[in-house]
A protein has these predicted regions:
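A generic structural motif
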Residues: 32, 97-101
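A conserved hydrophobic secondary-structure block that centers on an alpha-helix together
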Residues: 72, 93, 103-105
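A conserved short coil-to-beta-strand element within the FAD-binding core of flavoproteins
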Residues: 80-95
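Core beta-strand elements of the Rossmann-like FAD/NAD(P) dinucleotide-binding domain
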Residues: 102-111, 115
Length: 139
């Protein structure tokens, strides 16, 4: 299930139409208690909104469409089977240690964003490093 907000981001990436065309649009929401329907509500797009509230789409389609789109973007470097195993805060950057089946390497970045899913290997590393706790994250 993907929300309207996800679809809006995908529109910015140029894959929103493809996702909606393949997915199942939710038009009605229902709340049940046992066999009894307690409430029903409209999930159709709101006036002035392009996208519905939700669509159902298998994750493998979403991933495939995003990978297809990334192949058209030369500024994106997609790396498979790479795992961040360590982070080191520097004055103006972060040094990452990355493990691959071919061996480890280091990468320097200005920013690090943990977008590696529910079983993130990156977020626990960030959480345990006080160096990554900035005033912005503490307030």
């Amino acid at each position: 299930c993907f929300s309207k907000r996800s679809l809006e981001y995908w529109d910015r990436l140029g894959v929103g139409d493809r996702m909606v065309d393949k997915g199942v649009v939710w038009s009605v929401g229902r709340i049940f208690h046992g066999e009894s329907q307690l409430y029903q509500f409209n999930l159709l797009p709101e006036d002035g909104h392009k996208r519905p509230a939700f669509i159902n789409l298998q994750q493998y389609y979403a991933e495939a469409y995003l990978v297809d789109r990334i192949s058209d973007l030369p500024e994106v470097d997609l790396r498979w089977r790479n795992k961040v195993t360590a982070l080191e805060q520097r004055n103006d950057s972060v040094a990452l240690t990355i493990e691959t089946p071919e061996g480890a390497y280091r990468l320097h970045a200005q920013y690090v964003v943990a977008c590696d899913g529910a079983r993130s290997s990156l977020r626990p590393i960030i959480r345990t490093s006080r160096a990554f706790m900035t005033q912005a994250t503490l307030t």
